[in-house]
């Protein structure tokens, strides 16, 4: 296709030509040698045209598309790049961005890389062979499915690489000396990231790019440890302070409060699901910005991206969230409240048993009565949801990664204060046990977990509704007979305490 000399093909071409009926009849009139008088209608009919097919032969240039990567970038117009991109990829749209460069030194090669405007529908299809980068040696096409040439997460980048230094064996299909390929790969990744940063200079273009290929960038953060920090600069997220716009990690750092050491984030199913999460109550009140990471792949990316610009990334839903900005007086009040709620924490733990690892007084919630947090190194509620959805999941792994939950209670909440009073008055109060179980199940939902037994939860809610509506107790008793057990006996509770 890109041979330097022209290649022509002798082709047959069929064209349609219009001729009038008069032209067709002229020879006949000459032969007859007589002139006839005709009326106007016949004259109009003769004025009509008919089509005939003409066959012609000509030489057609086959290799019209010249190897533009051999020319200087400043000499090539935007239209030439667009034409080359369309011929290379069979795309009907123009490209979003282009990077034309040459590398010189121990290894020399020239390349043109393109970013398309939209992602192909089979971008993450594992059965599809990667054929986005075409490899040429001295302008002779060698292969387009060389997996060593570019990492999988950059599978959407299209382009051409042409090197005079690549040695080939007889079959032309197997490349020798992988060291050369590694050098080319390293340079291609570097230039791709440069190209993405150039796109980021135009907000409108970058929004299109990010919408189409943000998953690829996050996959790169998970897989490419060498370029993780550079790829992190390209990430964009909604946050508690960004409104409808998305913010970069770099901009987040510039807006950090004085004395703030960490970058706070929350993961979840959607922006709507996390923006009113109980985990954000104290952070919002204190004026801290929190990033909303609501893409499933964010869980994997943030698992590898431990820090950015020297700032640790801290999840708002896990243990280890410390906000050391309280005055000495506030700290003293908190300690007093923790002591007064110690007994309630023990009672709740006895009622819930193995469902939670421990019950503590919370520092992170302001309005909600309670929430459930996970271990610092375990799965978040969102990650647990993602792993449950895996068709081929490893159940043995999920048993220890979905670590025991810690229940955090809010001492300033009216429900908790009333519960504390009732529990102190009578530890075995039936209503206390029912309320604790109901609070635990609602905390599961608000914290992003799923219920193991939704029917029991629904039955408990219905029971509360009956009490609120003052429905006949006899009718209620009939309903309760069919309901699953909501509480333990006093003896069972004592046995757990001994254990």
From Swiss-Prot:
UniProt motif (TPR repeat-binding) ranges: 495-499
GO molecular function, one term: ATP hydrolysis activity
InterPro entries, A to Z: HSP90_C (IPR037196), Hsp90_fam (IPR001404), Ribosomal_Su5_D2-typ_SF (IPR020568)
An example Gene Ontology biological process: protein folding
Location of the protein in the cell: Cytoplasm
Cellular component, GO annotation: cytosol; perinuclear region of cytoplasm; plasma membrane; protein-containing complex
Chief subcellular location: cytoplasm
Statement: the UniProt record of this protein carries the keyword Chaperone: yes
Highest taxon listed in the record's lineage: Eukaryota
Region (Disordered) location: 15-51, 474-499
Pfam families the UniProt entry points to: HSP90
Sites where the protein binds ATP: 172
Alphabetical UniProt keywords: ATP-binding, Chaperone, Cytoplasm, Nucleotide-binding, Stress response
Subunit structure: Homodimer.
Family the entry assigns: Belongs to the heat shock protein 90 family.
Domain characteristics, as noted in the entry: The TPR repeat-binding motif mediates interaction with TPR repeat-containing proteins.
Role summary: Molecular chaperone that promotes the maturation, structural maintenance and proper regulation of specific target proteins involved for instance in cell cycle control and signal transduction. Undergoes a functional cycle that is linked to its ATPase activity. This cycle probably induces conformational changes in the client proteins, thereby causing their activation. Interacts dynamically with various co-chaperones that modulate its substrate recognition, ATPase cycle and chaperone function.
Protein name in the entry: Heat shock protein 82
Provenance organism: Nicotiana tabacum (Common tobacco)
């Amino acid at each position: 296709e890109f041979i330097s000399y022209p290649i022509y093909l002798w082709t047959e071409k069929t064209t349609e030509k219009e001729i009038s009926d008069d032209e067709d009849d002229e020879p006949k009139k000459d032969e007859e040698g007589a002139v006839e008088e005709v009326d106007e209608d016949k004259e109009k009919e003769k004025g009509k045209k008919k089509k005939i097919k003409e066959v012609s032969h000509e030489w057609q240039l086959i290799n019209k598309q010249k190897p533009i990567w051999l020319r200087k970038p400043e000499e090539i117009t935007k239209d030439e790049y667009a034409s080359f991109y369309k011929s290379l990829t069979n795309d009907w749209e123009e490209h979003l961005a282009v990077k034309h460069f040459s590398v010189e030194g121990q290894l020399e090669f020239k390349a043109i890389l393109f970013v398309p405007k939209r992602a192909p529908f089979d971008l993450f299809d594992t059965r599809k062979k990667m054929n986005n980068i075409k490899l040429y040696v001295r302008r002779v096409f060698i292969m387009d499915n060389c997996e060593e040439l570019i990492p999988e997460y950059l599978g959407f980048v299209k382009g051409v690489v042409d090197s005079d230094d690549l040695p080939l064996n007889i079959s032309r299909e197997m490349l020798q000396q992988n060291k050369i390929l590694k050098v080319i790969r390293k340079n291609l990744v570097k230039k791709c990231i440069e190209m993405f940063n150039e796109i980021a200079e135009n907000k409108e273009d970058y929004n299109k790019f990010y919408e189409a290929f943000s998953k690829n960038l996050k996959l790169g953060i998970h897989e490419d440890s060498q370029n993780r920090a550079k790829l992190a600069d390209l990430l964009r997220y909604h946050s508690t302070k960004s409104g409808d716009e998305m913010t970069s990690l770099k901009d987040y750092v510039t807006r950090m409060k004085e004395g703030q050491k960490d970058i706070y984030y929350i993961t979840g199913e959607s922006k709507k699901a996390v923006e009113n999460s109980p985990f954000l109550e104290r952070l919002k009140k204190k004026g801290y910005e929190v990033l909303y990471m609501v893409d499933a792949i964010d869980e994997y990316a943030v698992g590898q991206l431990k820090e950015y610009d020297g700032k640790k990334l801290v999840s708002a839903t896990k243990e280890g969230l410390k906000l050391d900005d309280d005055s000495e007086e506030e700290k003293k009040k908190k300690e007093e409240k923790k002591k007064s709620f110690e007994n309630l924490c023990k009672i709740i733990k006895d009622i819930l048993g193995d469902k939670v690892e421990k019950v503590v007084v919370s520092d992170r919630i302001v309005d909600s009565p309670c929430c459930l947090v996970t271990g610092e190194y375990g799965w978040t509620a969102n990650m647990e949801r993602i792993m449950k959805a895996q068709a081929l999941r490893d159940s043995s792994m999920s048993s220890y990664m979905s670590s025991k939950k810690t229940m955090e209670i809010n001492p300033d909440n009216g429900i908790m204060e009333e519960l504390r009073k009732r529990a102190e008055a009578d530890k075995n109060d039936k209503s206390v046990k029912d309320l604790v179980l109901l609070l635990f199940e609602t905390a599961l939902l608000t914290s992003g977990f799923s219920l193991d037994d939704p029917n029991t939860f629904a039955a408990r809610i219905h029971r509360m509704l009956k009490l609120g509506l003052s429905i006949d107790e006899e009718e209620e008793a009939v309903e309760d007979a069919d309901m699953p057990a909501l509480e333990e006996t006093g003896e069972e509770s004592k046995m757990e305490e001994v254990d």
